[in-house]
């Protein structure tokens, strides 16, 4: 669908309105003045429309930019983009303010005062600023490239930033996901091999557990907001039943059949009880559990798998009446105990079943604050709705049909999150819903992530460690946590680290304003010898620690490639600049092209252009970028689009915005339809490698707080916050607002007007007991049971019945 069109606006009313708007946004430019200066003569104004994508939100919704004389005056949703189908959230509409924000960084800046205090900067040319950054980077690269750190907040063109840039430099990199959803990602990679958290198959699901999903006001796994809500509404229209598990009702009320107001941080206990009930009531998909999980693997009294001479796990084959390798078994036993060679072995499923024996609904009710009857009811309904043994045909492919699903995402970020997510996944595994039609999904396509294999062979090394503490006795499963890195930077010897980064390149990230424990962040960032910041504004981090600030464009740039898939159809989008970059800002890819050229790693084998070719999959094709000539960003995307056989190359996106390939085939969506099924991964009920890692951590002297949750089966323990003094008698949770995205929206006036400040949601009974009324200012103080520290913040009270009385 072509959406670009041009026309002339004639007539004084239309022209006058546009002139007024133009003056408001852009000032009183000479183009509006009469040649003699004796009165304004409205000129014909050119209106056109440019397809692009949202710059602020997570999921890159399609947008149509309305322009007057080349300047954007309005954004609307792109009706042809599968992700948002013509709709936009408040962020999409309001980001026009970000483009014209007078507080944007207008030129490159160089600090003129000491760091650690409010910054003073002078304007610089791009040549001077880039030369300074390149010199500092090369000074350190000459000794050790890993001592250059590239850190991102939100990366919108992973190929060019996360991959090509860091590989060309050989530098370290650090993301923000440890504050977002990485716990869920790591748990799913470990358990079923998928790089995602949890979402349902909305086209076919009949029963959904909405587990901490902020229905109607936030995103979920993979998507930001609009896509899931539209799919939810369609599913509800055909009868989808929803169970909402959350201490706060949120906006889920009209879309929920049962609300379980769980005590914060006790999701693991509930998931264990659901597993216990499913097994007790016989809701088991035995063929799936026997064939595609490690449930039949034999476990010795030491907790380790029985293995043959080649190291392969053994199962008890009832056909052979003996132990054989898992892949060779004709009839593997899922349950039972077996005496082999004088030693007793239980199947992993048998170990799991016995492990769950005491995790009853009555036990979970005491822990979670829910009713035992409701817990048993959800387990019963989940098992019934799974329709174990049934099949359906989708696009000509017969698949197991298990129309029960789970949606979860940010709730994974809790103290027991890794094991909670594993247990929640096991709820779906028991009924065979993982990768089935209507069942549990985790990514858009069924592709086993490299971490699945790596996590099955966890390394726990002796120091010295690198500054992320990867493969250390502290964090064998490591996602690169900025908060931990900051603590290591401040005191590397404490963690057995000998070298810390000296130069940081911060890409759209604001650790001081966006991450927790500001004091620790400041202590860490003080250790960098040089900091370069790429972004449109002076953030708190740039203010205190940037040596150089490079002004990035907002939406006015080429960026991508971007997925436009809704999980049902396959589509690709590209961010197309709806106007030229304002001031002296540049698109990030332009910045990196210039920077790597200055550093000396743009050309040749292994250089930036070579890495771009590799990351885009073009290296061996006729469309590969030449390694001896500097392209424009548009030329790069034109080569890529032609490589992808998109008609017209990049011009297609400039005219259409999105390329819709078609419906995703079942072989990509469903694990059962993949070749081989589930990508060859054997799903882990029993985590032997977690046990081995725990033993190694203990041997190397790690404290209990580090190793206590490396258990082969999800195991409940009281969260550490229960050790706070009794005066701290409420639980504190956070939630997302659709009006804001991280800290990049806090300076957009339209969004600040819609959601001007945080509030404290509190149950009326709790508020009354404390003498708190609607709108009262209150202090909220929290206590760290590990360090004994307290932090407090002032906010205002909002009374709501949709909140547990012991939770705010």
Put a short name on every predicted segment.
Residues 129-148, 198-208, 355, 378-405, ...:
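Glycine-rich phosphate/diphosphate-binding loops that line cofactor/substrate pockets in enzymes
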Residues 154, 291-294, 381-382, 408-410, ...:
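A glycine-rich phosphate-binding loop feature that marks nucleotide/adenosyl-phosphate handling sites
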Residues 251, 540-574:
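Flexible glycine/proline-rich, aromatic-decorated loop/lid segments
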Residues 152-160, 215-216, 411-414, 510-513, ...:
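Gly/Ser/Thr-rich loops at beta-strand to alpha-helix junctions
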Residues 162-240, 244, 269, 331, ...:
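Extended redox/cofactor-interaction regions of prokaryotic respiratory oxidoreductases
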Residues 14, 18, 578, 588-643, ...:
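Long, contiguous, secondary-structure-rich segments that constitute the structural scaffold
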Residues 528-530, 537, 576-596:
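Phosphate/diphosphate-binding loops
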Residues 1-287, 291-333, 344, 362, ...:
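N-terminal export/assembly segments and adjacent metallocofactor-ligating motifs
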């Amino acid at each position: 669908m072509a959406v670009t069109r041009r026309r002339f606006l004639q007539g004084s009313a239309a022209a006058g309105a546009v002139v007024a708007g133009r003056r408001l946004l852009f000032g009183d430019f000479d183009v509006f003045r009469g040649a003699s200066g004796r009165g304004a003569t409205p000129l014909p104004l050119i209106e056109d429309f440019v397809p692009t994508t949202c710059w602020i939100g997570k999921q890159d919704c399609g947008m149509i930019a309305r322009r007057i004389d080349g300047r954007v005056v309005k954004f609307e949703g792109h009706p042809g983009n599968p992700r948002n189908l013509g709709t936009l959230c408040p962020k999409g509409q309001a980001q026009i303010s970000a483009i014209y924000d007078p507080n944007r960084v207008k030129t490159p800046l160089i600090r003129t005062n000491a760091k650690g205090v409010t910054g003073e900067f002078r304007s610089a040319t791009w040549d001077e600023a880039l030369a300074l950054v390149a010199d500092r980077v090369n000074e350190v690269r000459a000794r050790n490239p890993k001592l250059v750190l590239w850190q991102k907040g939100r990366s919108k063109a992973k190929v060019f930033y996360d991959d090509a840039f860091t590989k060309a430099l050989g530098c370290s990199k650090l993301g923000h996901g440890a504050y977002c959803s990485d716990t869920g990602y790591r748990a799913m990679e470990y358990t079923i091999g998928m790089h995602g958290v949890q979402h349902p198959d909305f086209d076919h699901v009949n029963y959904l557990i909405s587990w901490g999903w902020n229905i109607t006001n936030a995103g979920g796994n993979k998507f930001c907001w609009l896509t899931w809500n539209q799919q939810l509404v369609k599913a509800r229209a055909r009868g989808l039943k929803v169970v909402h598990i959350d201490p706060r009702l949120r906006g889920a009320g009209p879309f929920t059949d049962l609300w379980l107001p769980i005590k914060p941080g006790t999701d693991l206990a509930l998931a264990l009880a659901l597993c216990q009930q499913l097994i007790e009531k016989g809701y088991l998909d035995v063929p799936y559990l026997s064939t595609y999980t490690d449930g039949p693997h034999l476990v010795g009294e030491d907790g380790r798998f029985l293995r043959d001479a080649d190291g392969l796990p053994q199962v008890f084959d009832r056909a052979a009446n003996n132990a054989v390798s898992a892949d060779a078994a004709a009839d593997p036993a899922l349950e039972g105990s077996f005496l082999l060679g004088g030693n007793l072995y239980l199947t992993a499923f048998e170990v799991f079943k016995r492990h769950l024996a005491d995790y009853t609904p009555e036990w979970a009710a005491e822990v979670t604050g829910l009713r035992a009857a409701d817990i048993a009811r959800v387990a019963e309904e989940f098992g019934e709705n799974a329709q174990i043994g049934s099949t359906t045909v989708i696009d000509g492919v017969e698949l197991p049909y298990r129309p029960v699903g789970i949606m979860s995402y940010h709730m994974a970020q809790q103290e027991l999150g890794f094991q909670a997510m594993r247990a929640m996944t096991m709820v779906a595994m028991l009924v065979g819903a993982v990768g089935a039609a209507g069942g549990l999904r985790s990514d858009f396509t069924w592709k086993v992530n490299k971490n699945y294999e790596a996590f099955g062979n966890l390394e726990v090394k002796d120091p010295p460690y690198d500054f992320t503490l990867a493969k250390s006795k502290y964090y064998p499963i490591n996602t690169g946590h900025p908060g931990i890195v900051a603590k290591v930077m401040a005191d590397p010897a404490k963690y057995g680290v000998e070298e810390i980064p000296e130069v940081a390149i911060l890409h759209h990230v604001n650790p001081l304003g966006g991450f927790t424990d500001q004091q620790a962040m400041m202590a860490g960032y003080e250790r960098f010898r040089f900091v370069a910041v790429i972004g449109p504004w002076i953030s708190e981090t740039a203010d205190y620690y940037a040596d150089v600030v490079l002004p990035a464009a907002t939406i006015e740039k080429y960026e991508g490639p971007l997925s436009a898939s809704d999980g049902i159809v396959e589509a690709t989008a590209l961010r197309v600049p709806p106007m030229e970059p304002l001031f002296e800002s540049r698109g990030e890819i332009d910045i990196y092209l210039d920077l790597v050229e200055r550093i000396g790693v743009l050309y040749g084998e292994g250089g930036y252009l070579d890495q771009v070719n590799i990351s885009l999959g073009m290296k061996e094709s006729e469309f590969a970028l030449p390694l001896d000539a500097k392209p424009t960003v548009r030329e790069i995307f034109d080569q890529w689009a032609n490589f992808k056989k998109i008609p017209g190359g990049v011009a297609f996106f400039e005219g259409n915005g999105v390329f819709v390939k078609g419906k995703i085939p079942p072989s990509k969506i469903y694990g059962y339809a993949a070749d081989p099924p589930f990508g060859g991964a054997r799903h882990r009920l029993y985590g032997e490698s977690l046990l081995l890692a725990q033993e190694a951590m203990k041997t190397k002297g790690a404290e209990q707080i580090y190793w206590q949750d490396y258990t082969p089966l999800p195991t409940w323990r009281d969260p550490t916050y229960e050790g706070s003094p009794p005066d701290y008698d409420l639980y504190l949770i956070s939630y997302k607002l659709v009006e804001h995205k991280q800290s990049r929206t806090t300076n957009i006036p339209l969004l600040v007007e819609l959601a001007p400040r945080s509030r404290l949601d509190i149950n009326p009974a709790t508020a009354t007991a404390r003498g708190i009324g609607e709108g009262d200012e209150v202090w909220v103080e929290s206590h760290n049971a590990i360090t004994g520290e307290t932090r407090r913040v002032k906010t205002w009270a909002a009374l709501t019945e949709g909140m547990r009385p012991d939770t705010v």
